[in-house]
């Protein structure tokens, strides 16, 4: 893992370089896209970005949990949670990149 975190500013910079919008317009575009995704999720809609992922909101019912320290049963309130499900295309890209890095790190074993 590289440890790098991609930020909104990084996305805006990429739009600036690849699309040719001004830096301000690029930042506004990134903000607009993120706002639209967030608004749809808040409304309870699924957001499906083909070849990337699906974001969904799920309602979870009340259930009984357990305090790991004491073993005491504790009710867990009903709540809404957001899920992220990567597409198969994205999963394959991640796997391919992982295998490629792994093969580069493996030392060659010369016969002899």
Curated annotation (Swiss-Prot):
InterPro entries: Hist_DNA-bd, Histone-like_DNA-bd_CS, IHF-like_DNA-bd_dom_sf, IHF_alpha. One of its GO terms (cellular component) is cytosol. It comes from Rhizobium meliloti (strain 1021). Keywords: DNA recombination, DNA-binding, Transcription, Transcription regulation, Translation regulation. GO terms for molecular function: DNA binding; structural constituent of chromatin. Belongs to the bacterial histone-like protein family. This protein is one of the two subunits of integration host factor, a specific DNA-binding protein that functions in genetic recombination as well as in transcriptional and translational control. This is Integration host factor subunit alpha. SUPFAM superfamilies: IHF-like DNA-binding proteins (SSF47729). It comes from the Bacteria. NCBIfam families: himA, PRK00285.1.
């Amino acid at each position: 893992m590289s440890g790098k975190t991609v930020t909104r500013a990084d996305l805006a910079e990429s739009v600036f370089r690849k699309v040719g919008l001004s830096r301000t317009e690029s930042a506004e575009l990134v903000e607009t896209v993120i706002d639209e995704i967030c608004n749809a999720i808040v409304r309870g809609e699924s957001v499906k970005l083909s070849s990337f992922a699906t974001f969904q909101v799920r309602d979870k019912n009340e259930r009984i949990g357990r305090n790991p320290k004491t073993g005491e049963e504790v009710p867990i309130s009903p709540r809404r949670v957001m899920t992220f499900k990567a597409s198969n295309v994205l999963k394959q890209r991640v796997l391919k990149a992982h295998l490629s890095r792994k093969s580069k790190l493996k030392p060659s074993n010369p016969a002899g």
